[in-house]
Amino acid sequence: MASLTSLIFVSIVTAAHGQTVVSIPLGHNYTLIGPPITSEVIWTKLGSVDYFDIICNKTKPIIVTCNIQNLTLINVSKVYSGYYYGYDRYSSQYRNYLVRVTQLKTTKMPNMAKIRSDDNSLETFTSPTTPDEKNIPDSMIAIVAAVAVVMALIIICMLLYACRYKKFHPKKQDLLLRLNI
């Protein structure tokens, strides 16, 4: 079990190293470029039902086309999100991709009445005023009091330690603890 967990962890770390992050709009096609090849690139998708799912020969749940080097994702949907790993069978060349599927965002023209009202509000803008000394927030007073109490406790602990150290170790002469108490 530990070896399987370590294999998965090493695989994910290897896949995350040197990866290219790709954002693909929903419903579009996208081609992942494979590594330089000497024979044929094998494409796998990490994180699917099988940990290493070879995807060039499958049609479900994602539809892809593979040539010797590249992988084309067809009609991208949310299922396509994940890590894609392409490696050459006979060399150590590989490419990692993190595919993120995004929604296309439509932009609306702003309302001109809203823009005019925003212009008017800019004209009446005043700079913020600093708080009066009489209006100090309670939270600030509590924070300052807490810091003062903690500093006092630290000083008391240091003095108690110095006194106890001198009492139990009278023969040791520590330059920092030469207190005539």
Curated annotation (Swiss-Prot):
Claim: tRNA-binding is one of the keywords in the record: no
InterPro entries xref list: Adeno_E3_CR1, Adeno_E3_CR2
Keywords carried by this UniProt record: Early protein, Glycoprotein
Source species, domain of life: Viruses
Glycosylation sites: 29, 57, 70, 75
Coiled coil: none
Pfam families: Adeno_E3_CR1, Adeno_E3_CR2
Described function: E3 proteins seem to be dispensable for virus growth in tissue culture cells. They are potentially important for virus growth under special conditions; E3 region may help adenoviruses to evade the immune surveillance of the host.
Family label: Belongs to the adenoviridae E3_20 family.
Protein name as catalogued: Early E3 20.3 kDa glycoprotein
